[in-house]
């Protein structure tokens, strides 16, 4: 029987989950930055 990590994922599954997380997190950061810039252009807070 193959050994599994504490998360229950194999090494390959963990790498795939991490890659997907990086992609979605990067998209979130870009979207948040764009939203902040648009709000700042509309109504500067300093």
Curated annotation (Swiss-Prot):
Keywords, ordered alphabetically: Antenna complex, Bacteriochlorophyll, Cell inner membrane, Cell membrane, Chlorophyll, Chromophore, Light-harvesting polypeptide, Magnesium, Membrane, Metal-binding, Transmembrane, Transmembrane helix
One GO cellular component term noted in the UniProt record for this chain: plasma membrane light-harvesting complex
Binding site for a bacteriochlorophyll: 18, 36
SUPFAM superfamilies assigned: Light-harvesting complex subunits
Record InterPro entries: Antenna_a/b (IPR000066), Antenna_beta_CS (IPR023623), Antenna_beta_dom_sf (IPR023624), LHB-1/5 (IPR002362), Light-harvesting_complex (IPR035889)
A Pfam family hit: LHC
One annotated GO biological process: photosynthesis, light reaction
Keyword Magnesium: yes
Major site of localization recorded for this protein: membrane
Residue spans crossing the bilayer: 26-46
Membrane topology: Single-pass type II membrane protein
Record-level Gene Ontology MF annotations: bacteriochlorophyll binding; electron transporter, transferring electrons within the cyclic electron transport pathway of photosynthesis activity; metal ion binding
Cellular compartments annotated: Cell inner membrane
Superkingdom of the organism of origin: Bacteria
Entry annotated with the keyword Lyase: no
Residue ranges that the UniProt entry lists as topological domain Cytoplasmic: 2-25
Subunit structure: The core complex is formed by different alpha and beta chains, binding bacteriochlorophyll molecules, and arranged most probably in tetrameric structures disposed around the reaction center.
Family recorded in the similarity comment: Belongs to the antenna complex beta subunit family.
Function: Antenna complexes are light-harvesting systems, which transfer the excitation energy to the reaction centers.
Name assigned to this protein: Light-harvesting protein B-800/850 beta 2 chain
Organism in which the protein naturally occurs: Magnetospirillum molischianum
Gene field: B2
